[in-house]
From Swiss-Prot:
Keyword field: Coiled coil, Repeat, WD repeat
Family matches, as SMART domains: DUF1899, DUF1900, WD40
Presence of keyword Repeat: yes
Extent of the WD repeats: 79-119, 129-169, 173-212, 216-259, 264-304
Official protein name in the record: Coronin-6
Species: Rattus norvegicus (Rat)
Record PROSITE patterns: WD_REPEATS_1, WD_REPEATS_2, WD_REPEATS_REGION
Composition bias, Low complexity: 419-429
PANTHER family: CORONIN, CORONIN-6
Coiled coil: 430-469
Domain of life: Eukaryota
A biological process from GO: cell migration
InterPro entries linked: Coronin (IPR015505), DUF1899 (IPR015048), WD40/YVTN_repeat-like_dom_sf (IPR015943), WD40_repeat_CS (IPR019775), WD40_repeat_dom_sf (IPR036322), WD40_rpt (IPR001680)
GO molecular function: actin filament binding
Amino acid sequence: MSRRVVRQSKFRHVFGQAAKADQAYEDIRVSKVTWDSAFCAVNPKFLAIIVEAGGGGAFIVLPLAKTGRVDKNYPLVTGHTGPVLDIDWCPHNDNVIASASDDTTVMVWQIPDYTPVRNITEPVITLEGHSKRVGILSWHPTARNVLLSAGGDNVIIIWNVGTGEVLLSLDDIHPDVIHSVCWNSNGSLLATTCKDKTLRIIDPRKSQVVAERFAAHEGMRPMRAVFTRLGHIFTTGFTRMSQRELGLWDPNNFEEPVALQEMDTSNGVLLPFYDPDSSIVYLCGKGDSSIRYFEITDEPPFVHYLNTFSSKEPQRGMGFMPKRGLDVSKCEIARFYKLHERKCEPIVMTVPRKSDLFQDDLYPDTPGPEPALEADEWLSGQDAEPVLISLKEGYVPPKHREFRVTKRNILDVRPPASPRRSQSASEAPLSQQHTLETLLEEMKALRERVQAQEERITALENMLCELVDGTD
């Protein structure tokens, strides 16, 4: 009598659970634009969602704690003249977010810690270089102020948003529309998928294709690709018969896939969200009502199905919280923000554990908010892995950091770097001055809000008087 051997994995019993109704974000008009991006971005401080807006594109930014019904007059981030197609939080500053639009521009915004009283309309910087709509954004994982954008002009531009300069422009690699772009862990390589059905590995600083695979998935529908911790490329796509499919590839040998699995028949593009700490990939399809997740290992069959979280309502987009934003006391290993037609619903993935102690095996050190390189260091050829932090004591977001743009003058000579010194008592007034400026900004915003409310009350009182006079 043979006995079936069950594969041992600490993630075998991961289960998903939707948040209670009072923990959702209600009455949000999620964008109806047809585009295969996530429409949602989240970090440990804020939730951003692309929304419907008249007269151009907009997105809403909410503090994570602001759950419940969102007022219809809640301030938006506006400035684009066309629909917003993608948004992405800076991994090194939780108050900075980039947006890409149908209007061919990329804008970078500074979000205040306090709730603004009116729409945010002035970006810190506008990046203009594409000739057609911009639909893909991705910040460099380790270099400060380095942002990638990809447009309908088949061009990838890598920017230094601190100066507004174009660092690199990859304009002769893709012959057709780019479907996805992903950095590897240290930002030395890119994985891209294209309408020509080719998966490419690119060295951006050399503008060279390191490896490529034609028809990684044979269908005509869009592919997606992400790097894994082991250096493989995980892809989602479609078969020739329009079945959804996932694949795992070794970029050193693209001849045959490491793994290739057919999924189901559906038109929705599968968006992969990969967690390198656990090596779990979560697949979320637009229009689906489920999240399927797989563990990627170096043992056959290499891509191991774990489970499926199912709900009743289809998803219109999905946000994925960075690991440092999770609640380690509850053994969360992932948290999603599912977009419905009129709301956003958190979904938590948990590993059941009996002990209340910190689970070291679930939470290895993870990338923190500090960059490992400056933009010019990366451009010169340096590489560095992310600066890791421990989650043992729980992650506390740093205080608000100002994002500044410096227009570099080519005649300027950069002074030599001064040796680092520890913070002394003489530096304390600078910190106090920054705190005072922040408080003054918040007081000004509160005064403006009170004035606006008083004007609204006066208008309502006048309307009431007119109604009373009309009934006499």
